[in-house]
């Protein structure tokens, strides 16, 4: 491959991030680092089980690649369930919660790292996810829905920063079901407002025109 060629591939991207990590660190740095280490051990064990590999870490974030969408989802579900058990234990001092986003898309390989929209959308899905939750893209949903027993909640088309995508929550508990504004509903609202403005301006123009006609006739 020449230096100018871009090395691309299709990949399943898994992004996990700790909720409120900075606040935990401010409260008790040592205990938080210890708790994160234990969560990391759980995740590494599951990544090994489901054949996922970490390609980047940034502070409290973990970015991993999977060859299988089903494996990525099952890894995420098992990880959240393991964390729930850990947090319910009275022995757990610092209870860390994670958000997880999973996407399948085109990525660029560079110096052992993965870049591009495929990664960016996974990160946006992670930001969209609830604490202790998992959000996935439609590309993942279409593959895993007939092959897994988990429950999904359709969030519709979402826009986070510059990325627009169809998202789904994986419901680990019925209480996680939510309804949030979709990109299409925002467009409908904007269209409705624009239409109202046009009608209002049309009414003003019609009123002024009729008034002028009456004045001229007099």
Language-model segments: residues:
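Catalytic NTP-binding/metal-coordinating core of nucleotidyl cyclase/transferase enzymes
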Residues: 2-75, 82
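Exposed boundary/loop context
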Residues: 13, 45, 52, 94, ...
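Feature marks short, surface-exposed loop/turn motifs that line or immediately flank catalytic pockets
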Residues: 20-22, 108, 174
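A generic signature of intrinsically disordered, low-complexity regions enriched in glycine/proline
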Residues: 21, 32, 190, 212-214
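Intrinsically disordered, glycine/charged-rich C-terminal tails and inter-domain linkers
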Residues: 132, 139-210
């Amino acid at each position: 491959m020449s230096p100018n060629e871009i090395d691309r591939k299709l990949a399943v991207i898994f992004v996990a991030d700790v909720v409120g990590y900075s606040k935990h660190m401010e409260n008790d740095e040592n205990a938080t680092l210890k708790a994160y280490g234990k969560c990391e051990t759980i995740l590494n064990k599951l990544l090994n089980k489901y054949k996922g590999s970490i390609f980047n870490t940034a502070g409290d974030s973990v970015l991993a690649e999977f060859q299988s969408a089903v494996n990525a989802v099952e890894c995420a579900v098992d990880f959240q369930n393991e964390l729930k058990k850990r947090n319910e234990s009275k022995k757990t001092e610092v209870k860390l919660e994670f958000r997880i986003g999973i996407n399948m898309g085109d990525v660029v390989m560079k110096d052992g790292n993965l870049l591009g929209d495929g990664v960016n959308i996974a990160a946006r899905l992670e930001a969209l996810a609830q604490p202790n939750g998992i959000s996935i893209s439609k590309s993942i949903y279409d593959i895993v829905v007939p092959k897994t027993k988990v429950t999904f909640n359709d969030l519709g088309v979402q826009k986070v920063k510059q990325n627009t995508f169809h998202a789904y929550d994986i419901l680990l508990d019925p209480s996680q079901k939510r309804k949030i504004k979709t990109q299409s509903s925002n467009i409908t609202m904007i269209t409705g407002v624009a239409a109202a403005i046009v009608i209002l301006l049309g009414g003003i123009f019609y009123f002024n025109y009729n008034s002028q006609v009456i004045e001229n006739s007099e």
